[in-house]
Amino acid sequence: MKKNIFKIFACLCIVGFTACQSWLDETKYTYSISTATFYNTPNEANAAIVSVLDQMRSAHNSNWFASLEINTEHIYPKGVYQASGGYTGITNTTHLTRCGSNFQSLYRAIMRCNTPLSRLPEASDMTKEEIASYMGELYFLRAFCYWNLVRTFGSVPLRTEENMYTWDLAKSPVADVYELIVSDLKKAMQNCPDKARYYGTPCKNSAKALYAWVCLDLKEYAEAKKYAGDVISSGMYSLVQVTSGDDFATKVFGEGLPTTSEEVFYLKTSMTDSKTWDYLSYTAHPQYKYDGVNTVCKTGYYTHYTDLNNPVIKNWDEKDLRRSLNIAHYAFSASTYGENTCLLLKYRAPNASGSKAQIDIPLLRYTDVLLTYAEACARTGEMANAVNALNQIKRRAYGADPMVANPELDYKASDYADYDQFFYGALLNEERYETFNEAKHWFFEERHGKWEELVQANYRVACPWPRTDETSIGKEITVAQMCHLWKIPAEEFNYNKALDEARDQNPGYAN
């Protein structure tokens, strides 16, 4: 990597509409960028943002979602992912390679943040306010990437604009990675625009929402409550009202939706320039028609699924619209997997081209903010506020007005004397049903230290995995270390001489 010339190939996706609903023209933003002459104008700064988003879309692909979903207590793997069943960790070569690609895409996104962060302060054709605003967006994106890196790979090399030309770089402790994440998000909260420039770019509230979420990891509950509360009280977001599971799928996660009132930060997709999302093909079955007419996706591998016998599914109230949004009973191979298998339906794209679907990737929803606020309030003894936030989510899930009290549905603060009672009596179910198939629930389990307990209580209670392994029913499960941290790819050790694979590889992975 040479300091004189550092080239990035930035291909713009259609990020979305502005507030006046005008499209970005991607043909204006295809560059071979030299840092010696670039990052001087708003258009060039925007190209830098789009280049990062393009890599983030690659990082949060089908494997990202599949790998995190199959770790939960209610999802079962098959195909390439079947080797991870039973919580033995990631051992399949193809699966390991895919996780390595996630690692590399996140670092490419970080690199595409670092370069403009080093150059924008010297921009010749922007005001100080414009420079600060674009840098705020880049700090947000870098923080998001490092947050997902540290949660899946643990200690990693900390590459910033200050050391980006240093190739050989040792791993930094998890605490140091979080320190950078917090620092970046504080800069983002200060400098991001008040409103997103385009659908799919961050604003101050995006940064506040992510900062609050990160604070839960750090047990900074007062901070989490304050900043999640700021986002809620801003009035910028609201829950979309729905009356059926199909309504949910169309209005909240619908194919081709430009945006919704609960989008805090999504990665945008477009069929026009093939900036699409392939995860739907991992959950779909090519012959299943969810409304009798449309397939979920034109291509389907159904690499993971759930089962009616799993207690999480078995106890899911059928009046809860999220149930019909998320699952459909479909016995795709009864002789192997039993009669009670269910496909995952949250994302539906009947107009997909093969595995390419125009469904925006919901990294940060308003419901995540409400869940963050509820958890933080309960942690700090404000049970009434915690319950109020959860009740909004639950009311909407049952087709009711989320802002109107509903005695038949509402949780009551008086029922929960402490956090544990609140966790088991309200928060756990609302979080796992609301974030079902969004690659979030496993991190929630890890943050609470509940993975072993929840897996043991649900995964093998009644549902054999697979059907041929009926002797496993009821047996104790040990969650391997490899379920918590993915394997750092070999390329990182081959080219980064500050790392030693025997010393620096994550636990459980052979050299």
Regions found by a protein language model. Give the residues of each.
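Acidic/polar-rich alpha-helix caps and helix-coil junctions
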Residues: K2-F6, C20-S67, T93-W277, D317-N511
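Bacterial N-terminal signal peptides
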Residues: F9-G16
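Residue-level detector of transmembrane insertion/anchoring sites
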Residues: C11, N309-N310, S355-Q358
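Conserved oxyanion/phosphate-binding beta-strand-loop segments in alpha/beta enzyme cores
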Residues: E69-Q82, F103-Q104, M111
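Non-catalytic accessory segments flanking enzyme active sites
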Residues: A83-I90, C113
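Active-site-adjacent substrate-recognition loops and nearby beta-strands
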Residues: W277-H285
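Short, cationic low-complexity segments
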Residues: H285-T306, V312-I313
